[in-house]
A protein has these predicted regions:
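Transmembrane-helix signature of polytopic, membrane-embedded enzymes
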Residues: 37-58, 90
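Short acidic/glycine- and proline-prone juxtamembrane loop motifs at membrane-interface regions
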Residues: 64-72
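Specific aromatic-rich, kink-prone transmembrane helix
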Residues: 72-88
Length: 344
């Protein structure tokens, strides 16, 4: 609501450039939020009201304007919509554009590959992958060519940074666990890789083909939980996926409560750099980080149960279809690794 005032001012007052910039940025970000909400409504099939989870989540008010993360959020939501409409090329292009803003939309390709293996339908996945690579290269190549040092900065930082604020690793250090003996990049890659292998195994051996957003949500939770850093706005990444994968208000509110608690804790902890007497100590901060991690794992645990016991899945109640399944919804006999075959 402050954005229009920040742009045009009141009573002829001169508005500082920083406030004007914030106002314009906020309007653009909330336009992207509306786009993400529309895409979620369109992707939700017979449950369009599930998009209210995205529209009304406390995280939108708390961290919606903290960074430009609503851009990849909107692009990933559009990519899922494109896949649900059986437009793999468009899905891939949107994934590539999203990955140019934040790398995490690329994780959707892992989920698509898993379902391609399970259904033995690789055509759509191949087109989506090519579209993603092409779009990412088209956006990044000019900057990598003209400004190579600036372009590499993000990737160098991601490679070289240690365990940073909000991460499980930093909280373990504050609690006395000797994580400093680990190489940060190797530790993160190793643990994330193990979790992804587990998610793939779950998806391939589940009694019914998992839904696309269920697999994507599990992979993304594994990514943010094991990452070197956890910024408060990362909760935005999960919102459309939670709305589509686990649309139960009780569970969403439990998860959002954990995120809100962490939001308060991280600013209190960071306050030690300006006012140490009014800040949160390291050990207390670590406890709040673990609460945030537990809220993510709570959602992940419910989704795992929904995959292994589909009767608990609120979206699949009375049906086997996946609203976002796209070409994977084409019925065919699936050769299962279980003793008895099932129909995807």
């Amino acid at each position: 609501m402050l954005a229009p005032t920040a742009i045009i001012g009141t009573s002829g007052a001169v508005i500082p450039r920083t406030i004007r910039y914030y106002g314009i940025t906020s309007l653009l970000l909330y336009a992207l939020l509306l786009l993400a909400i529309w895409a979620t409504i369109a992707s939700a099939g017979q449950r369009p009201w599930d998009a209210l989870i995205l529209a009304t989540a406390p995280s939108i008010a708390l961290v919606g304007t903290l960074n430009w993360d609503l851009l990849p959020v909107a692009l990933l939501a559009l990519a899922i919509l494109a896949w649900s409409r059986e437009r793999p090329w468009m899905c891939g292009v949107l994934v590539g554009l999203g990955a140019a803003a934040k790398l995490y939309p690329l994780l959707l390709l892992i989920a698509l590959f898993v379902l391609a293996v399970r259904t033995r339908r690789f055509g759509g996945f191949t087109r989506a992958m090519l579209g993603a690579v092409g779009a990412w290269v088209a956006v990044n190549l000019p900057f990598a060519w003209l400004y190579p040092e600036g372009w590499r900065t993000f990737y160098d930082l991601s490679r070289d940074r240690g365990f940073d604020f909000g991460s499980l690793w930093l909280s373990l250090r504050f609690l006395g666990v000797p994580v400093d003996a680990l190489d940060p990049s190797q530790a993160v890659a190793g643990l994330f890789g193990l979790l992804v292998v587990g998610i793939i195994a779950l998806s391939l051996f589940a009694p019914m083909r998992p839904r696309l957003v269920q697999i994507m949500l599990l992979i993304l939770i594994a990514f943010v939980v094991t990452n070197k850093v956890y910024s408060p706005q990362y909760a935005l990444w999960l919102l459309p996926l939670v709305a589509l994968a686990r649309p139960r208000w009780r569970d969403v509110l439990i998860w959002q409560a954990g995120q809100a608690i962490y939001y308060v804790a991280v600013w209190l902890w960071l306050n030690k750099f300006t006012d140490a007497d009014r800040s949160l100590d390291d050990r207390s901060y670590a406890i709040f980080v673990l609460i945030q991690v537990a809220s993510q794992l709570y959602i992940a645990g419910l989704v795992i149960r929904d995959i292994w016991q589909p009767e608990h899945d609120p979206v699949r109640c009375g049906t086997t279809a996946d609203p976002q399944g796209g070409e994977f919804n084409v019925e065919r006999a699936e050769v299962s690794s279980k003793p008895t075959g099932v129909v995807a």
